[in-house]
């Protein structure tokens, strides 16, 4: 009632959501965009507009949003001349003007303008974009904008985990990100905010637990409970352990990489052995399957352990493994048994090593040093956000490359080209008709069809 202005801010946020099942769900970034626009009473193209009272009166006080804010996407248009003769219309290149403003000189490197005003895209536009000085400068400016951001997050979150004001911190971090993005073109700051918010959901829960239960809760271990079926009923049972704050996998990846690598190598070899065994079965000929029927299952797609072991044991009483020529039934059985035995040993070894690593992880968490805790919290809280934020420039550049490629493909094949291809195909088909034979009626029909193809 006391406002100086009588304008009404109308916002169309109907495009800002994600699908959640059957429902449309606003993300934190969508909500933040709405709040900021309303707070600033800002005019944003295709999103919001300050509408005068007089304009509303002229519309008989009809407040239907599309009357005032058109959020629809521009329809795709097709240039008649370009469709007939090729080339890319200047106005369609102009539609990418935000990129040309952000990357000076790039447009001229990508397109050769012909005397008729239409352009041709140069070869390998993706490589031109990737190597252009303005694009490289954009990437470097973005990287510099976030110099020290990891240290900033560490100081605010990790170093002050017991005292940081959780309810206020997300907004402080948001303002820092927005400040860093000032002057960086093309970046949607609300996409960056969404990345922060998604990570903050995890960080804030951890911070609240640390402040509620004390710093030592970081060293706490809890039973890992899972729901399993027992006698037809769901029952919660313990399946190992888990860190209350620090997940086991982060501890293992950060503090015991050699042990994790050793298990990964065993798992890789197990996968290879199982592949080789499957490939061995798949390569069997029908004759092989007949000769090996005693050691194969009814579907002939797997070896049976007991008869296979028995047959190989008999073979080894009278000969050495290397005595058998590759491809013989004896060689195949020995190879299959060796692969099965190797797989069995690998599975046992992997299971034992994983149990040892889990036990070591549990003991390690319980005696973590302050330095180790800082390192692990950095890995859980900060590194995922830094990784997401660092992907923004490449996403923007990929979008531009896709748009240029689409423009190039749109008019690459003209109607004249298509007509030529059709005529060529019709001519080839008409030629093939001459080689066909049939009854008099069939030949008459083929002759008429050939006439149609010839356009006579």
Where are these regions (language model features)?
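A conserved structural/catalytic subdomain of Rossmann-like adenosyl-cofactor enzymes
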Residues: 1-248, 262-263, 267-269, 276-285, ...
């Amino acid at each position: 009632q006391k406002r100086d202005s009588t304008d009404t801010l109308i916002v169309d946020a109907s495009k800002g959501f994600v699908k959640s099942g059957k429902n449309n769900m606003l993300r934190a970034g969508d909500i933040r965009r709405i709040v900021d626009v309303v707070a600033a009473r800002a005019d944003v193209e295709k999103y919001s507009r300050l509408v005068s009272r007089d304009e509303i009166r002229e519309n008989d006080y009809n407040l239907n949003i599309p009357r005032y804010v058109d959020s629809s996407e521009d329809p795709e248009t097709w240039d008649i001349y370009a469709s007939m003769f090729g080339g890319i219309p200047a106005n369609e290149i102009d539609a990418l003007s935000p990129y040309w403003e952000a990357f000076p000189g790039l447009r001229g490197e990508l397109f050769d303008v012909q005397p008729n005003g239409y352009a041709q895209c140069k070869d390998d536009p993706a490589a031109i974009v990737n190597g252009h000085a303005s694009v490289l400068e954009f990437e470097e400016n973005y990287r510099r904008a976030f110099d020290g951001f990891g240290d900033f997050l560490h100081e605010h979150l990790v170093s002050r985990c017991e005292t940081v004001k959780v309810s206020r911190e997300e907004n402080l971090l948001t303002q820092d990100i927005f400040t860093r993005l000032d002057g960086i073109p093309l970046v949607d700051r609300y996409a960056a905010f969404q990345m922060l918010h998604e990570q903050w959901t995890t960080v804030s829960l951890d911070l609240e637990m640390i402040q509620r239960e004390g710093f030592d809760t970081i060293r706490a271990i809890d039973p890992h409970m899972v729901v399993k079926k027992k006698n037809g009923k769901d029952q919660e049972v313990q399946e190992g352990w888990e860190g209350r704050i620090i997940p086991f996998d982060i501890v293992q990846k950060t503090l015991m990489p050699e042990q994790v690598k050793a298990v990964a190598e065993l798992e890789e070899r197990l996968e290879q052995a199982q592949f080789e065994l499957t490939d061995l079965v798949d390569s069997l000929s029908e004759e092989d399957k007949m000769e090996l029927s005693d050691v194969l299952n009814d579907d002939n797609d797997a070896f049976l352990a007991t008869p296979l072991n028995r047959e190989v044991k008999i073979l080894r009483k009278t000969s050495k493994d290397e005595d058998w020529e590759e491809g013989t039934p004896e060689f195949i059985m020995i190879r299959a048994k060796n692969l099965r035995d190797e797989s069995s040993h690998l599975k046992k070894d992997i299971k034992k090593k994983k149990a040892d690593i889990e036990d070591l992880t549990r003991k390690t968490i319980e005696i973590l040093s302050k330095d180790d805790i800082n390192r692990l919290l950095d890995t859980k809280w900060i590194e995922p956000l830094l990784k997401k934020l660092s992907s923004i420039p490449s996403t923007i550049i990929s979008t531009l490359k896709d748009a240029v490629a689409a423009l190039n493909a749109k008019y690459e094949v003209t109607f004249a080209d298509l007509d030529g291809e059709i005529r060529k195909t019709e001519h080839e088909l008409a030629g093939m008709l001459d080689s066909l034979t049939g009854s008099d009626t069939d030949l008459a029909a083929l002759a008429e069809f050939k006439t149609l193809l010839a356009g006579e």
